[in-house]
Amino acid sequence: RMQDRHEQNFFDMEVETQFSAKAIGITHGARPAPLDWVSADEMHALVSLSQTLHYGVLKDTGEPAGLGLAEWVRGYAVLKEIARERTAAVASPKGYHLVLDRQDVLASLVRCGLSSEKAERFVTLASLHRSARDMFDCPLVPVGSAQLLVFAPALLHLNIVTTVLSNLANRGVQLSRKGKAFEIAMQDFFKKQGLKVAAFKAHRGGEEYEYDLVVAWDGRLFVFECKNRSLSLNDPVAAYYFEQEARSAAGQVNRLADALRQHPDLVEAQFGAECSGWPVIPCVLHSLPYSRSGEFEGAYFTDASALTRFFGEPYFRIKAPYKFGKVMVLHRTAVMKLWKGDKPSASDFIAHLDEPHQVMLAAKHLKIKGFGFELSPTEGATSCELYRLQYTTRSICEAVGADPDEVEQIIADHAKKFGDMQKELKAKGEL
């Protein structure tokens, strides 16, 4: 889902702003962002990283592992552009085997806005080492002291946001601002929806209860335990510990929910006597895209992306762009209604938590594929991996229970209308 979210953000940014045209590349150098952008990937990564962390990366003064987050992004963006340029120049598989002078890589980073010290630091952090997760995080392999072997396939398909977060997580670096920033962002979000919100600490029976976010809504109290943890990113060991953390988080939020049930004066102090006795619904709220269908260990699991999109509009839609000269028109076809009325209700939200369409889409487009490989002339092995099926209008509709024939007809009708409009405008010389 994180990959889906980034791809959708990239698509939306390109359709709405044509931002890729603003990238200047690395050949002639670049000033630090936002004065210059070396690529569309860099622009998209900075926006997505700010959304993920819930604070502006460009304004952040922290230096996790010795680099600012914008410097992390610029470093990977420059490496990705180097890989693109070099592989494009050699039209054969040999183009993917890149051995570069270390000083040339450092010079490119300095020319593109990093100081000499920061360029050295980035090359060190992006170089393969014993505890590195893989060559996507660390695509540089030192060859002696003067050269770098560049793993071009990893760079060409690099997702900068996930790579930065994964590299930092692998080093045990925690972004100190992200936890509190996420809590504040979610509190502010619910307040903007016109709902009663509380965040507080309380003591009862010698125990402390700390509430990140409690929302009073339509006769219910939603207790959210906010989590800003890195995802496992398909690492089996990390996935195991992530699952353990999910169970622990469910236990935490259930404990908080039980305290509100057992001590109604806590509710009265925050929301008034009229809210006392309301049903309490425990939820774990992740900053990164991680939701589950229905309850797990007695709690719902949702995430900021799914939650904000639920409140954003009453429909889940399929988007189709049409270009008129330099103007991009976006047609959106509704395929699923999220609200029963004109505004979201608590009942609608619970229905969403029971069956998040984002999870339904992801699950319907994942398959397990087996493959074999040779270990020696006489031995082999097999393994299984998840792989993604291609999204189509029909597959999306089938995943969420919409009529694919009806939706495809609507899209085809609008495509014809846009095509006729283009022909008419061209005939008049207005396009």
Can you say where each PLM-predicted feature lies in the sequence?
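Catalytic cores of nucleic-acid endonucleases
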Residues: 228-285
